[in-house]
Design a protein with these regions (language model features):
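Electropositive phosphate-/nucleotide-binding environments in soluble metabolic enzymes
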Residues: 17, 21, 45-52, 96, ...
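Anionic-ligand-binding alpha/beta catalytic cores of soluble enzymes and soluble regulatory domains
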Residues: 108, 122-202
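Active-site histidine-anchored catalytic micro-motif
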Residues: 4-6, 30-35, 47-50, 61-71, ...
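N-terminal beta-loop-helix "entrance" segment that forms/cooperates
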Residues: 38-58
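Short acidic-glycine loop/turn motifs at beta-strand connectors
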Residues: 85-88, 171, 212-214
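Gly/His-enriched, cation/cofactor- and phosphate-binding structural elements
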Residues: 199-218
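Alpha-helical scaffold segments in soluble metabolic enzymes
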Residues: 22-26, 54-57, 101, 134-141
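N-terminal glycine-rich anion-binding loop in soluble enzyme alpha/beta folds
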Residues: 4-42
Length: 218
């Protein structure tokens, strides 16, 4: 593998502590040539669905890169760390459903590997900070041209954890849809697409009324 000039980071670490900087520092020590692009560090803590939606919406617009994503409430458990090859990128992070939608947005998973090779992680691995100790080093080594299969054994992509399908039901002339994300500007993304809109006679750009327990808004 030729390596990468870019590494992106998407986490729930926030900016009030040094977690983000620690990941930057580990990457810089191993792959000083790589530029790091911060997608966001403001994912709702532990909200894997939120992180997966933001990542999937963003990575198609980024240059060829190693994309590191860490929203990892299962850190320190038996959950796997993985690297997924997809499109012109490699996605690195926990096997908890976070990475799969992003891989699908890049055209699907070509291959998947479990991150178990100690040579490509820090010598001391914290039970609670795999972003710094496992995922950032793996990404940096990939950026330097290390082949993904050096990081650990190939795994069946169908064995990867996936998130439950968001609720979306067409009920007569109504749609009941789960809220997937609410962005910084208050825009609400629902688990409803063009097919569901067409089923009740609507189209992109149509005016609708939203009802929830606090009231309704057009």
């Amino acid at each position: 593998m030729a390596g990468f000039d870019w590494i992106s980071l998407c986490t729930d670490y926030g900016c009030a502590d040094g977690f983000m900087a620690a990941c930057h520092g580990v990457i810089a020590r191993i792959a000083s040539h790589a530029r790091v692009l911060d997608v966001t560090h403001a994912i709702t803590p532990g909200d894997v669905r939120h992180g997966s939606a933001v990542l999937a919406d963003t990575v198609p617009w980024l240059p060829p890169a190693v994309h590191v994503a860490v929203v990892d409430p299962g850190v320190g458990t038996a959950r796997r760390g993985v690297a997924l090859l997809s499109g012109d990128a490699v996605l690195v992070g926990p096997d908890n459903g976070l990475l799969v939608p992003a891989a699908q947005s890049l055209g699907g998973i070509r291959a998947a590997y479990e991150l178990v090779e100690p040579s490509y992680r820090l010598s001391a691995v914290s039970a609670t900070f795999h972003g710094r100790d496992v995922f950032a080093p793996a990404a940096a080594h990939l950026a330097c041209g290390v082949s993904p299969d050096a990081l650990g054994p190939a795994i069946d992509p169908t064995s990867l954890v996936t998130l439950p399908t968001p609720v979306c039901q067409v009920d007569g002339n109504r749609i009941r849809a789960e809220v997937v994300t609410v962005d910084h500007f208050g825009n609400v993304a629902l688990a409803a697409g063009a097919a569901e809109l067409a089923a009740i006679g609507l189209w992109a750009g149509a005016s609708v009324t939203l009802r929830w327990p606090a009231g309704e808004q057009r």
